[in-house]
Structure formats: C-alpha cells, structure tokens
Swiss-Prot record:
Assembly mode: Part of the 50S ribosomal subunit; part of the 5S rRNA/L5/L18/L25 subcomplex. Contacts the 5S rRNA. Binds to the 5S rRNA independently of L5 and L18.
Upper lineage: Bacteria, Pseudomonadati, Pseudomonadota, Gammaproteobacteria, Pseudomonadales
Stored HAMAP family: Ribosomal_bL25 (MF_01336), Ribosomal_bL25_CTC (MF_01334)
Gene this chain is encoded by: rplY
Function statement: This is one of the proteins that binds to the 5S RNA in the ribosome where it forms part of the central protuberance.
Record protein name field: Large ribosomal subunit protein bL25
InterPro entries: Rbsml_bL25/Gln-tRNA_synth_N (IPR020056), Ribosomal_bL25/Gln-tRNA_synth (IPR011035), Ribosomal_bL25_b-dom (IPR020057), Ribosomal_bL25_C (IPR037121), Ribosomal_bL25_long (IPR001021), Ribosomal_bL25_short (IPR020055), Ribosomal_L25_dom (IPR029751), Ribosomal_uL5_bac-type (IPR020930)
Length: 198
C-alpha cells in the first residue's frame, strides 16, 4: 500500500488525433511500462492527475496505479506539460519491481539562496528536476542543492552534488555533467548602461 493512488483505463484509440480528442474530453494520455511486461497505453482523468501532483512528493514516491481494477506499483518517469499554461499533457510511468533499478525524476530543492544574493548575485535555476537511477526503496524525495558558498560566477553542476546512498544521476552516468544552477551578476538594463557611459 502506498500513500498515493491513481485510477486509469486502458486506451486503444492511439495517435495524435486521439490524444487531442482525449484532452478535449478532460482526460490525458499516459503510458506505463517496465517490469518485464508489455507497455500499456492509458487514459487518466486530467483533474485527478493534476490533484495528485499538486503534492511534490508524488514525483518521488511509489504510486498505486489502478488500471481497470488491476493494481500495480509505479513511479513517474516523465511528464509533459503545456509550455504556456503548465497543465499536464502526458505522463510516463514505470513499474516498480523489487530488487530492480528504475529511473525516475525527483525535484530539486535549493537552500541558502540568500547567501549569494547578499553578495550581489542573481541565481538562475537551470534544472528543477533531476533524473535518477535507483531501487524504489532508495528513491529520494528531492535532491538538495546548497548555494551557501556560491559566489558570483559560480556554476553548480551535477558532479558538485552528493547523490544519496544507492542513487545515481542518470545524465552524469552518461557523461553529461549538466549545470543545475548558476550565480551571475545582475543584468544591467540598456538605459542604465547608456547613462553610465555619459
């Protein structure tokens, strides 16, 4: 039993046109795969999945997915949102199998942001989520990024972060040392630059 549950139905009407029709009927398309079983295309009520993921913890916890009465434990693998309005357009779930590693996205929590700001810096959050690989039992609620010692010009990469025990950063494992955040000098408006030149 998990703290998070979600209902879904098997979807047979596939394709872009079908996905558009689904969204017009206030549902969204989704897929669940992994666990040595075939992938299933699903339909989920948009309001239900939106409510579930209002709780940030749902991104990094096992979810009991009820597909037409058949229950399976999953974690969210990826989620597509509308670029302007932010609502969920599509979700990918991966089945949880004891003893097997899975990949999932977990939120990033930035702490001590006031330190570089006091030094005159501005912070850019490059990543709000990080993809990790681990067993379900080791899945962290979030990845903490401490900006307490950051100076202007500091770029924090994945390699600067300490992964929790049993957890691997997927991008880093593939040689992609992504930037997670950076601290830069305040941007000067063009008018201010012209005034300073005079």
């Amino acid at each position: 039993m998990t703290d998070f549950t979600l209902n879904a139905q098997v979807r047979s009407d596939l394709g872009k046109g079908a996905s558009r029709r689904l969204r017009h009927s206030l549902n969204i398309p989704a897929v669940v795969y992994g666990g040595d079983k075939e992938a299933q295309s699903l339909t989920i009520v948009a309001k239900e999945i939106a409510k579930l993921f209002e709780n940030e913890a749902a991104f990094s916890h096992v979810i009991e997915l009820n597909v037409d009465g058949a229950k399976q434990n999953v974690v969210v693998k990826a989620m597509q949102r509308h670029p302007a309005k932010g609502f969920i357009m599509h979700a990918d779930f991966v089945r949880v199998v004891a003893g097997q590693k899975l990949t999932a996205v977990v939120p990033v929590h930035f702490i001590n942001e006031e330190a570089p700001v006091k030094k005159g810096g501005e912070i850019s959050h490059v990543e709000s989520q990080i993809e990790v690989s681990c067993e379900a039992k080791d899945l962290p609620e979030f990845i903490e990024v401490d900006l307490g010692n950051a100076e202007i010009g500091t770029i924090i990469h994945l390699s600067d972060l300490k992964a929790p025990k049993g957890v691997e950063f997927v991008a880093l494992a593939h040689g992609d040392d992504k930037a997670v955040a950076n601290v830069h000098a305040p941007r000067v408006a063009p008018e201010a630059e012209e005034g300073a030149a005079e």
